[in-house]
Amino acid sequence: MWAQKILVALLIGYAIASKVFQEAKVGDRVVLDLGRDVVTWKRVRDNNKEEYIKYCESGETEPRCKGFVTEDGEPATPTSKAHVEKDGKLIFDPFEATDAGLYSSPDQKPIERNEGGAVSAVLNTHIALTVKE
């Protein structure tokens, strides 16, 4: 019984640890960073719709290269002054109140296999970006 309680406590701890809280002032330059493996970012704002943006090499023309878009490729509204840099960082310049939301990346790999065949799993990191008053 005590082992189950410890397991539940650990799972709750891992779930909380996977969410990072970041405040930003309207008008500031804001940088979100989930690591170098990130090309595509996903966000969910108050409207509960998933929106995507990604880093693109020169010559790529898909809608996600130009700014946040909905799953069907339509520009997200209200718009953001945001882009993804080659190193995977999401930059807002400037940050607007409508940019507040939950940010993550579908590029993060929660399950990894090492050379010996062992499997490890971690929860994807989510950044809750809020407006600092």
Where are these regions (language model features)?
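C-terminal edge beta-strand
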Residues: 113-133
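Solvent-exposed, conformationally flexible loop/turn segments
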Residues: 24-31
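Extracellular/luminal ectodomains of metazoan preproproteins built from arrays
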Residues: 19, 27, 132-133
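N-terminal V-set
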Residues: 32-78
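Ligand-binding face of N-terminal immunoglobulin V-set domains in extracellular IgSF glycoproteins
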Residues: 77-118
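Cleavable N-terminal signal peptides of Sec/SRP-targeted secreted and luminal proteins
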Residues: 2-17
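A detector of helix-start/N-cap boundary segments at the beginnings of structured domains
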Residues: 18-21, 92
